[in-house]
Amino acid sequence: MSETARTTIDQSEVDRFSAMAAEWWDPTGKFRPLHKFNPVRLAYIRDRVAEHFGRDPKSRQPLEGLRLLDIGCGGGLLCEPMARMGADVLGADASEKNIGIARTHAAGSGVRVDYRAVTAEALAEAGESFDVVLNMEVVEHVADVDFFMTTCAHMVRPGGMMFVATINRTLKAAALAIFAAENVLRWLPRGTHQYEKLVRPEEIENPLVASGLEIADRTGVFFNPLSNQWNLSKDMDVNYMIVAKRPI
């Protein structure tokens, strides 16, 4: 198959999330787990970006002047806080409905975000480039992981960085992130995740390294039911995040 014919889009996944688009900003709705997850991933992104670019993470706008892409942005749960931290944000999603919800919410919140209903490959073909690329809870929903990671890596500027967050393909993840989360606790609608589409860390890292990026950090993330919060962890068996950087 030629590169131009390849696609990262799994239309069934786009349709699934489009059907839930109206609930993106409801903290008690179908995206409640992402609302719970947001504080730990926001802090992780802010701190790693500030460290890399020599910024003060406690300043009001530590991302000022940086161009940031949130690919698969959904309703904008990450885009808006990134914009508030000073970044020039492009939020991209294959779902027109998601983008519509994101635009409406940003307008009501007074936050400036450039939202586009566009694919990663279309952005890359247009020559777009960014200081920071976010792939957060997206890769397990795409059609071609290797092509997706390679495509996104090409949009990382020299000296820039990429964040990836996803779910590991392990029996532990199948038990906790799929069976328990979707069937027992009902945190997510059934069918949100499929075991065969979960992604192991090396399946993220290999195409990034092949595209000239260097792996800079890895961390697991776990949910503590006692504190009702997500925390960073050394255990990457279920949820995890990876940071990669492109040398100058």
Swiss-Prot record:
Keyword flag Methyltransferase: yes
GO BP, sorted A to Z: methylation
Pathway(s) the chain acts in: Cofactor biosynthesis; ubiquinone biosynthesis
Keyword 4Fe-4S: no
Transmembrane intervals: none
Enzyme class: transferase
Positions annotated to bind S-adenosyl-L-methionine: 41, 72, 93, 136
InterPro entries, per the entry: Methyltransf_11, SAM-dependent_MTases_sf, UbiG_MeTrfase
EC number(s) reported in the record: 2.1.1.222, 2.1.1.64
UniProt entry keywords in alphabetical sequence: Methyltransferase, S-adenosyl-L-methionine, Transferase, Ubiquinone biosynthesis
Catalytic activity: a 3-demethylubiquinol + S-adenosyl-L-methionine = a ubiquinol + S-adenosyl-L-homocysteine + H(+); a 3-(all-trans-polyprenyl)benzene-1,2-diol + S-adenosyl-L-methionine = a 2-methoxy-6-(all-trans-polyprenyl)phenol + S-adenosyl-L-homocysteine + H(+)
GO molecular function list: 2-polyprenyl-6-hydroxyphenol methylase activity; 3-demethylubiquinol 3-O-methyltransferase activity; polyprenyldihydroxybenzoate methyltransferase activity
General function of this protein: O-methyltransferase that catalyzes the 2 O-methylation steps in the ubiquinone biosynthetic pathway.
Similarity remark: Belongs to the methyltransferase superfamily. UbiG/COQ3 family.
Name this polypeptide is given: Ubiquinone biosynthesis O-methyltransferase
Species of the source: Sinorhizobium medicae (strain WSM419)
Underlying gene: ubiG
